[in-house]
């Protein structure tokens, strides 16, 4: 099907933007283009690759942690130590409270998002071709961070942590006061303050998830357009420069997601006395 779609750019692009989905009511694979209720479907490809990449990250760090040496470290240990120091430095500079969870959480967010973004550099037809010819699957997308369901799920996880630490440190009363007495500290403006603070609070996970999704979806779309619209002998002249530039985008988006997570949790952890 992939080879056939190359002659029709529109079908080729549509095919590469289709997820491998399962209907939860019948547990059957949904064919691309078929009508279905989005509320009862799961993007299996996004779930699979995000879990595989997360497991890969945890396994590598666990094995290196078990074999860590005090002498001259190996290349992998050195690389992981540099990443750890980089993340730890950012946490110390941005998080004002004391919480042993923030540094491991920030490291996990940074590496996991980076690995999911990195899948965008895999040749666009590689996994779809294997999934179709070997496993007879109708579609396959391999960049989890280009799926809005994944990015919003991660940002909602951060949002629930924001609510948890806000209530834990400031209490329910302090949280309520923060909603109705800021930015104008007068009861007359309570409703107006609540609307402003509620919009500001809810916009955090939405903007966090949409920012990552938008950048990665756009990057994936450019690779698909290059592969679907241009002759094969011209693709390398655009794919290679864009891939090199995209490495910066991949790293930057992982860094931004981590930084905003730290900043939001730092704001939630500040008491009224700070």
Swiss-Prot record:
Quaternary data: F-type ATPases have 2 components, CF(1) - the catalytic core - and CF(0) - the membrane proton channel. CF(1) has five subunits: alpha(3), beta(3), gamma(1), delta(1), epsilon(1). CF(0) has three main subunits: a(1), b(2) and c(9-12). The alpha and beta chains form an alternating ring which encloses part of the gamma chain. CF(1) is attached to CF(0) by a central stalk formed by the gamma and epsilon chains, while a peripheral stalk is formed by the delta and b chains.
Membrane topology: Multi-pass membrane protein
Principal location class: membrane
Family in the record: Belongs to the ATPase A chain family.
Disulfide bonds: none
Entry keyword set: ATP synthesis, Cell membrane, CF(0), Hydrogen ion transport, Ion transport, Membrane, Transmembrane, Transmembrane helix, Transport
Gene responsible for this protein: atpB
GO BP: proton motive force-driven plasma membrane ATP synthesis
The keyword Cell division belongs to this UniProt entry's keyword annotation: no
Transmembrane segments: 44-64, 110-130, 142-164, 212-232, 243-263
Role description: Key component of the proton channel; it plays a direct role in the translocation of protons across the membrane.
A Pfam cross-reference name: ATP-synt_A
Keyword Hydrolase (UniProt): no
InterPro entries: ATP_syn_F0_a_bact/chloroplast (IPR045082), ATP_synth_F0_asu (IPR000568), ATP_synth_F0_asu_AS (IPR023011), F0_ATP_A_sf (IPR035908)
Single GO molecular function: proton-transporting ATP synthase activity, rotational mechanism
Name under which the protein is recorded: ATP synthase subunit a
GO annotation, cellular component aspect: plasma membrane; proton-transporting ATP synthase complex
Subcellular location(s) of the protein: Cell membrane
């Amino acid at each position: 099907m992939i080879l056939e779609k190359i002659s029709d750019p529109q079908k080729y692009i549509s095919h590469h933007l289709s997820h491998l989905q399962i209907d939860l009511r019948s547990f059957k694979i949904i064919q691309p283009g078929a009508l279905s209720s989005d509320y009862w479907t799961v993007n299996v490809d996004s779930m699979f690759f995000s879990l595989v990449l997360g497991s890969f990250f945890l396994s590598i760090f666990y094995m290196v942690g078990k074999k860590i040496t005090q002498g001259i470290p190996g290349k992998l240990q050195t690389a992981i130590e540099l990443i750890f120091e980089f993340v730890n430095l950012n946490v110390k500079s941005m998080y004002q409270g004391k919480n042993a969870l923030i540094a491991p959480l920030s490291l996990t967010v940074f590496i996991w998002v980076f690995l999911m973004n990195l899948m965008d550099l895999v040749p666009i037809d590689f996994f779809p071709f294997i999934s179709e010819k070997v496993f007879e699957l109708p579609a396959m997308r391999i960049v989890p961070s280009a799926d809005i369901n994944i990015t919003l799920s991660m940002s909602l996880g951060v949002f629930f942590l924001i609510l948890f630490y806000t209530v834990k440190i400031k209490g329910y009363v302090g949280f309520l006061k923060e909603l109705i007495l800021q930015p104008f500290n007068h009861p007359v403006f309570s409703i107006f303050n609540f609307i402003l603070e509620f919009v500001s609070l809810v916009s955090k996970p939405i903007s966090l998830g949409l920012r990552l999704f938008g950048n990665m979806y756009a990057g994936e779309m450019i690779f698909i357009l290059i592969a679907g619209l241009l002759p094969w002998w011209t693709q390398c002249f655009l794919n290679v420069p864009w891939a090199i530039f995209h490495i910066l985008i991949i790293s930057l988006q992982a860094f931004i997601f981590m930084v905003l997570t730290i900043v939001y949790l730092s704001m939630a952890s500040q008491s009224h006395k700070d």
